[in-house]
Design a protein with these regions (language model features):
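N-terminal secretory signal peptides that target proteins for export/translocation
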Residues: 1-17
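General secretory precursor processing signal
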Residues: 7, 16, 26, 340, ...
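Low-complexity, intrinsically disordered or signal/transmembrane-proximal segments
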Residues: 16-19, 37
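Conserved active-site regions of diverse hydrolases
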Residues: 38-366
Length: 366
């Protein structure tokens, strides 16, 4: 979000809980009560739907719907130099994107055989993400300025999941779940405990979905936050932000490992998208991605945004989203390759099947 869209407070940010990391297993044991039938792991599903929980990186219109209902103007939208409903560029922004459209989950859906529709939940779709969502329960106040005079109340990720489960009691293995958040928690954190809380919250969000029958996941971690335009100008802001992202990612990775181990009889597919490593790779070698600028925002500038990584001070361009989508699609393809290799009894699977966390973007447009 640009500096004019400044978050001011959250009514649902996590409370301090002592000894959180040591309580992972106990929490998950108390949290898990629902039996799930194992699926045939030899035949990966053709995803017919994608359900998204997250923040502004995945929002496709929920915040814009709220602002339109309250103020008669869609923000994000052309009024604030964003493509309609999304915190990124598009054909209706200045400058305009020419080659890409939509946030990463929309672009990911377009690569899948069934091409599942991505639409904001307030419009009847399955994208429950809201800009400025935190990882916890409840709601947050998202301000469009420096005070709460122009603001909307958004659902945090825990609340997003609760809303989804309230109307979707049955989950099939043809549904891919995306759970991505944490940046707003970190940008508003006042202590290391706040960062750890965010990772714990996200772990419990994932386990709650598993308890309800979800088995197919894409779970991105956070990029090095100190490298975004808002924070990359000085070591005093960039270094702590990146260290916070590293800590959050460590807690999340540990939590995912616990979820995987605790539910090993359920054949979960918890694919982790290593955005931290991916962004470091992009910024180290931008020309490999046909990018010319990976440090500044392109919003309102006389530049080609398709050659920039960032649109505003925090969010990627649609080209940046394209790289994320391509990487996520490769993770899915690698997973299918490994499972088909296992089913065929191959002892030396194809090299493309190696590893679960993809960082390369060989399928991206160069």
């Amino acid at each position: 979000m640009p500096e004019s869209l400044t978050p001011i407070k959250s009514t649902g940010s996590p409370a301090h809980r002592p000894h959180l990391v040591l309580c992972f297993t106990a929490l998950l044991f108390a949290f898990s009560t629902v039996a799930v039938h194992a699926q045939d792991v030899h035949h990966p599903p053709d995803y017919t739907s994608i359900v998204v929980f997250g923040d502004s990186l995945s929002d496709t219109g929920n915040v814009a719907d709220l602002s339109e209902a309250k103020y008669g103007v869609r923000i994000p939208g052309p009024y604030a130099d964003y493509t309609d409903g999304r915190f990124t560029d598009g054909a209706d922004t200045e400058p305009a994107a020419e080659n890409y459209f939509g946030v990463w989950v929309e672009q990911l859906a377009a690569t899948l055989p069934a091409k599942p529709e991505i639409k904001a939940s307030l419009d009847g779709g399955t994208d429950y993400a809201y800009g400025f969502a935190f990882t916890g329960d409840g709601t947050s106040v998202f301000s469009f300025g420096t005070s709460d005079e122009l603001s909307v109340v958004v659902n945090n990720i825990g609340q997003q999941i609760a809303d989804y489960l309230a109307t979707h009691p049955k989950i099939t293995d043809k549904t891919l779940f995306v759970v991505w958040g944490g940046a707003n928690d970190l940008l508003n954190a006042t202590s290391e405990d706040d960062i750890i809380d965010a990772g714990i919250n996200q772990t419990l969000n994932i386990q709650r979905l598993v308890d309800s029958g979800a088995t197919q996941f894409i779970i991105p971690n956070l990029p090095p936050l100190g490298l975004v335009p808002r924070l990359n100008g000085s070591p005093t802001t960039s270094v702590p932000a990146t260290k916070a992202a590293e800590l959050y990612n460590q807690v999340l990775a540990g939590g995912i490992a616990v979820v995987r181990d605790f539910n090993r009889d359920r054949h979960l597919k918890l694919a982790q998208l290593d955005v931290f490593a991916l962004f470091n790779q992009i910024i180290a070698a931008p020309s490999s991605y046909s990018l010319v600028n990976v440090t500044d925002s392109s919003q309102g500038m006389a530049v080609d945004p398709d050659t920039y990584l960032f649109w505003d001070s925090l969010h990627p361009t649609t080209r940046g989203h394209d790289i994320l989508a391509t990487t996520a699609a490769e993770i899915i393809a690698q997973r299918e390759c490994r499972e088909h290799s296992d089913a065929a009894g191959l002892t030396d699977p194809h090299a493309d099947c190696a590893g679960e966390v993809a960082v390369e973007t060989s399928g991206a447009k160069h």
